[in-house]
Structures are given as structure tokens and as C-alpha cells.
Amino acid sequence: MSKISQLLSNKIQVKIFNRGRQTAVSWVLLVSLGIILALVLPTHAEDTPSPVKLNQQGRNYYSAGKLDQAIETWQQAAAAYTAAGNDRGSRDSYLNTATAQQALGLYDRSCDSLLSAFKITDNSCNQIIEDVQIIEPQLDGIKTLNQKAKSKLLPAIAAINQQPEEQDKVQGLLRFGDYLRASGYPRVANQALELALASSQKLADPQSKTATLLSLGNAQRAIALQKQNQFSTQTIVLDVVANNSGSVTSALESYQPALDYYQQASEVTPRQPDSLKAELNRLSLLLDIQEFWQGAITDFDRHLDSLEINDPEFLQEITTGSKTLKQDLEQRLESEIGNAIAQVEPKVTQLTATRGGIYSRINLAQSLMRRGASDSQTAQILATAVKQARSIKNVTAEAEAMGYLGSLYEQQGQYKSARRLTEGALQLAPTAEYPDIAYRWNAQLGRILAAQGQRVPALFAYETSFNTIRTLRSDLATTPVEPIFREYISLLLQAEPSTSQLAQARDVLESLQVATLDNFFRDPCSEIAEKPVVIDDVDSKAAVIYPILLQDRLEVILTLPGKPLRRYTIPNLTPEKVDNTIRQLRRNALTNPGFAEQIRGARGNPQSATEIAQLKTSQEKSLQQDILPLASEIYSWLIEPAEAELKASEVQTLVFVLDGSLRNIPMALLYDQKEQKYLIQKDYDVALSSGLQLTAPQPLTKHKQPIRVLAAGVTSEFPAYRFPPIPKVEDELNTIKQIFDKSEILLNQEFTKARLEQKLENSDFPVVHLATHGQFGSTADQTFILSGTNQGDPLINVNQFDNLLRAGNLKRSQPIELLVLSACNTAEGDSQAILGLAGVAVRAGARSTLATLWSADDEATANLMGKFYTNLSQNTQVSKARALRKAQLELLMESDSQYRHP
């Protein structure tokens, strides 16, 4: 018997308690309730006994982990205090309610409680989020609450900050900061928390100060993660190695504020629960940093050749710098992590059987599991947590501890014990009563059963987890669920899946697209079609291709008109191989983005014929050597296995629901080496979809009225954003007006957010065409377009843009059928950015989007758009995909064409 097994058999037995309904508790409770309770218990003489008793009951429920009952009781106490005219008691009860709601992850509801606590009636939580979406990007780079930051203070924060210097004010700001951070706005959260810290210092209250420093650490941690996600790992490593001499200090710079706040929190009141939480959070952050940099440097070294550095001296410099950085970081982080464990572990193991102590044990055990520490040591910590939770009858804590103990066994390959513990956790916290716990343990059970070769029960466990996640969509908008979805798809597509399993795999993939959009926008507002769209109902000549990147292979599900689903597999094709191929193709396709300008410039020279010939020879060589082989390889993955069936079904339109890095290149670029044709030259119209759960496409020409376009654009440069002028935009908009004379134009200074909103609200434009600078990044904060205003900030961030389009839709009789973004860039190699681009249209109700995947020549864009709209105007039955394909082919096939590929 292993050491873990001996320990487990000695420490615990899996047994199930009969109990009343309780609501699940997240193991990460960042701020203790004791601060508020200390205020609530000493009541005023004029209070009636009823609210006092209710407050005590709420406290008892909270300590026992019965948070839903605590919330209900404190809400009753607040109502009783209000009826008695006791504002202070009512406020304390609402603050306690908000604390318990946040402990359950119900941050949206905690906002309502906070507004009630401070009687803020002129701001709803929805309005607060709309304001935050504007303020958050403006605070990027502002490290302290200086005068500029204070001028952008959220009205609700300002209202709380105007309260007298009392504990209630500190707690209100603290809870509001935690709410904003959890909602995805850590910079605005930081404002509230800095004000809370200042108040706690004025009150000389060490407990409040500790809690606030802890929350500031959490906010700064979220900011550091956002910064980390802004750039590729290669860019981050290269910046540190090339520009900062491989400095460890530089590598840790974005994380240092969070580490410092955690350290300060642990020192103010060393024996308090929040101090211990700060130490545990600091340890987990150090592990996050270590894992990120290990992966980043490994990825950088692996792809160093793809950077195409021609200077041998510089190449040697960064190669050496990368190696040195890796060694120095490893030494520094190993030392800090070791010291952190040595300091916190003795404190945790001495904790008594309280709710906070149990979750501290679970927190430490998770870090030790990531660290690869002694299995018996970690098992002992978790076994004690199970025993303590049982002793105080805290079922949720017991289920959490037991589930993580099962995870430890799973890591060690002891699947029999892992299964027993995981099933025990699910019996304690069944799906119907504890969905936000159970979805994780059901997925874990699915993995364990699959490892034991029990595919059918494993599929059932995964299906339960998947269905639970869908019901929890509103609560999991910022929670990554991708690993669970991909594990489930992989299992569904093993061996010879049935038609129903193929359909389920397709549905799971589409749900993953929805979840990714929810995570991108930080809320679950991507509208799902009430009824899944059957492609035959939309286009009887269309096929849908679903490539799915799995750990060890590429799977493709094919939907053909009127036929059962089929699937084909490309074995041993890993996501890394796909990523490398896509990255190289994209880079090669953009090696000389100025080629068109060079051709045009050469036409005016005396030796133009010779120069043009040389340019074309060079570019043709690059095309044959660097682009077509890679485009052909991807074609062989996605199209070649289905060619015969596509022809037999007389398919005319290929709709791609792309996965991962496959979103980073246009499918029109795929190349059939046998026929020596691009995909769009093979009589296929090409369209992309973010998933038919999300869209119900309709022909643009369904409208009987003449097509009207709202066309807005900017020609000027924006030095602050490093965007050059795009002079051909004016020609582009004028061409649209010539083709569709009922269209309206907003150019340069006429193109403001207010004018755009007015036009969208007052007129039904089936097409909205925006020819302006913009960027789509991996998060909503990095995604924006620029208006032409010369007063104030020209930036329209993605949430403002989303609100503009949605507000217009509320007053429109018809939705926007086509949204065109003809000059925007997507972040290089960022597949989520492309999905986010499509998501803007999906959420706003626009049925189709046409946009550039990378920086395009403005004259080429103007020409393409002119041909595209001409095609739409000449044939009222033509689809948008057909009109675009025809325009692309016209540019490619022109004599003396300056364009090499789609």
C-alpha cells in the first residue's frame, strides 16, 4: 500500500451526510467576514431584538458554510433594520450580504447589495459597468490614484468615498473593488481599493488595512495577467532579452506590485486570516510566474529561427541572453517559492477546524500539487481538511477537499482511489444542488474513467459537466472551460463515433466558441440562436467544415447538404505543428506588404518595364517557395479528404467554423497543388462562421428596399497609436455613394461617436461600413476603432462600439445584415482576436462581418470594396460570399496584376 493510501485509510472514510440544501462555496475566499461582523454584533440600544437575532443567525450560517441561508437571513435583517429606521444596522447587514454573495461568486448580486447599503439610487449596476467600460482603458499606465485618475472616478465609488471615515466606508470601497476586479476591470477596482486603504490608515485599523492590501494584491495580479496576455510569448521574451539585457527585475516588473501588496498584507497583522491568505496568494502567484516564464522561454528558443534575424552578432546576443535569463529566473523563483512554502506551511498545518482554515489547507495543497511536492505531505493536508470539514459539518468544504484529494491520486495514476474520492465528492455535492462545484468533479471523473478504459461512463460524466457549464453560463463568463470541452470532444471522436456523437462533438465545439466570446467580453451576452440553424435551411448548396485541434490530432467534422455528418482525422498533427505552419504562412504572406506600392511606383519610372519585371520575378519566387507549399499543406488537412464528397454533393459554398490558430489566415488562401488553384478559384464561395448556434444568416438582398449603406471613415494619421494616413478611404466611401445613392457618408470630423449613434438609431441601414483605423486584440480592452473627432478621445472601445450597435438595433425594424471593417488590424497570431472581431457583430445582431485579417494596402482595399459592392448591386440574388469571391478573383486575374494571392 502506498504512503498516500495508508494515510488516507487512517485519516478518512468516504461517507455521506443527510443534509438540507446548501449552496456551493468557492474555495477562494479572499476577504474574511470578521471585520464587518465585529461591527454588527455590538448593536445600538434602540435596536429591536429581531434584527439583532437575525444578524447572529447570519453569522452562524456563514461560519457553517451555509452561505445561501446567511444571505437570506442578512437580507431579512437589513429589511428589519430599515423598518426600524436604523440606517447603520441596515447598511451593515447589506455589507454582510455582499460579502457572502462574493464568497459564492455572485458578484453581480453583491453590486445590488452594495448600492442598497449606501442608498445609491441614481446608478444601476448595468450603468456602472457601462461607465467602467469607458474608464478602464483610460487608466492603463496610471499606477497611482493621482489627479488624472481622480478625475475619472466612478460616480458610485465617489459616492461611497464621501461617507464619514468609518468602517462601513472602508468595507464598502473594499467590496466594491472586489466586485469590479471579479467583473474584469482591475484598474477601476484599484481606484476603489486605494481609497479604502487610505481610509483604513486614517482609522488606524490594522485588520481593514490587511484586507485592503490583500485585495489590492489581487487587483494588481489581474492587471499583470492582462498585460501578459497583450503580447505573444516571443515578443515578451525578446523585449526583456534585447531591450533590458535579460534582467530578472524587468521580467518580474509587471508582477511586482501584486507581490509587494501581498507581502505588506502578510506583515500588518501576521496572525490574522487575511494575512495568511495573502501569503498563500503570493505563493500561487510565484508559481504562476514560474510556469509562465518556463513556457515562454521554451517557446522562444524553439521558434528562434522563425524570427529571421539576419545579424549573427545580434542572434548570438539574444540566444545567450535567453539562456542567462532562464537560469537567473529559475534560481530567483526557486528560492522565493521555497521560502514562501517554508513560511506558510507551518502556519496552515496548525489551523483549527474553521471554514477559513479548511480552505487555507486546500489552497496550500493546490500550490504543493503544482510544485510537485511530497505526495504524502499534500495528501495529509487534504485529508485533514476533509476530517475538519466533516467535524464542523461543512459539506461544501468537505466536497472540495475530497475532490482535490481525488485529483492528487489522478496525478499519480492511482485511478481506483481517485475515482472513489471523486465520486464521494459528487455524492456530497451533487450536480443539482452544487453545480459550480460539481461540473469540475464530473469532468475529473470523466478523465479518470477514460484513463481506465471505460468510455461510455466517461462520456456520461463529461456530458453532465458540459450541460452543467451551460446552465452556469452567466456565472462562468470569466472562467476558462476550454480544457473540459476539448477533453470531451476528444473522447466523443475516439474509435468510430456514432452520428449522434458527431453531432454532440460539433455542438460542444460551437459552445466553446460561445464560451470564448463570453470570456472575451467578460459577460454572457453572446446571443445563442433559440433553435440551432440547419444549414440546408439557409443554403442547400453549402457545406460546413469544423476543424478541431486536439492534443494529438486534428479532427474535421463535415456537414453536407441533406446527408449525415461525417468526420476525418489527421493523426499526429498537434496544435503546435498547426500553430507553427500558420505562423510561418502568415509571416511569409506579409514579408513584403509594400509590393503593390512598389509596382505602382515603378510604373512612373523610365525603366519601369525592367523594374516591374524584376519585382514580379522576385515575388513569384517567394510565392512558389514560401507561400504556396504551406497553403497547400493546410489545404491537404482541411479540404483534400473531403474533395470527392464536396463535388458529388455539388457544393457551392464552404462555411468554415475555425478553431484556434486556423482563424489567423484567410481560407481563400488555401492552395490545391494538383490543380494549381487557390480555394476561391475552385468554384467555391468561402465564408466563416463563429458557429451556427450564434448566427442565423440571411441574404442581404432579402430587403425589398434599395440597399443603403452607412459609410464612415477616417483618412488622417494617428501618431499616438502609430497609425499612418489612409488617403484612399475617401475614394472608397465615394465609390459606395456612387453605387448606392441612398447611402450616407461620415468622413473624418463628421465621423464621431455621437453622429454614428444618431444615424444608427434613426435609420435602417442594412450595411454599416467603417473604413478607419482599429485594432482587435485578445481582450476587449485591446480592441477598438478610431473616430474622426478632433475634440476629446477618438477611441471607441469594443464595449462602446457594441453598445452603439445594440442601441441602434433596439430602434431598428431590421437588423444590420452586413458590418464591414475595412482598415482594422488584428493582433498578430492572436486567434482570439479574430473570434472577438466576429463577436462584435454577433452580439450586436449583425448577421455578417467583412474585415481584414491584417494590415492591407488602402488602394487595394478601396478597389476590392468597389468591386464587392458593384457585384451586390448588379445581381440582387448574389450572396455576400459570392460577391466577395468574385471581387477577389477580378483583382487576382487582372492583366498586369499587382496582387499575388488572396
Language-model region placement:
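N-terminal secretory signal peptides that target proteins for export/translocation
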Residues: M1-G20
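Classical Sec-dependent N-terminal signal peptides that target proteins to the secretory pathway
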Residues: R19-L41
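N-terminal leader/linker segments that initiate helical-solenoid repeat arrays
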Residues: G34-Q76, A83-A84, R88-D92
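Alpha-helical segment of the N-proximal tetratricopeptide repeat
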Residues: V52-Q69, A80, Y179, N244-S247, ...
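Non-membrane alpha-helical segments in proteins
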Residues: V52-S63, R88-A103, E130, P137, ...
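Short, charge-rich amphipathic alpha-helical segments embedded
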Residues: A77-Y94, A103, Q513-R522
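Alpha-helical solenoid repeat scaffolds used for protein-protein interaction
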Residues: L115-F118, D122-L139, N146, L154-A158, ...
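Catalytic cores of enzymes
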Residues: D537-N572, P606-L623, I627-P902
